[in-house]
UniProtKB/Swiss-Prot annotation:
GO BP term, pick one: spermatogenesis
SUPFAM superfamilies, per database record: Mitochondrial cytochrome c oxidase subunit VIIb
Protein name as catalogued: Cytochrome c oxidase subunit 7B2, mitochondrial
Residue ranges crossing the lipid bilayer per the database entry: 34-60
Membrane association type: Single-pass membrane protein
Mitochondrial intermembrane-side positions: 61-81
């Protein structure tokens, strides 16, 4: 069991080290990496490709989707045994 004084000292040290680390990172010049430069373009082109592929699939290759059986299914007569 830690004494309250030691526990407070350790927690304040952790907080100070976190704050110092954040201050160091905020002063560093951030050079753009791949995601900063091309991230939105890659995301937009990937989305456009997926949408175009699904639109083509849904409309052009002749899949019979069978969304509703109304008008296609007729009930059969009961067979009495």
């Amino acid at each position: 069991m830690m004494f309250p004084l030691a526990r407070n000292a350790l927690s304040s040290l952790k907080i100070q080290s976190i704050l110092q680390s954040m201050a160091r990172h905020s002063h560093v010049k951030h050079s753009p990496d791949f995601h900063d430069k091309y991230g939105n373009a890659v995301l937009a082109s990937g989305t456009a490709f997926c949408v175009a592929t699904w639109v083509f699939t849904a409309t052009q290759i002749g899949i019979e989707w069978n969304l509703s059986p109304v008008g296609r299914v007729t009930p059969k007569e009961w067979k009495h045994q």
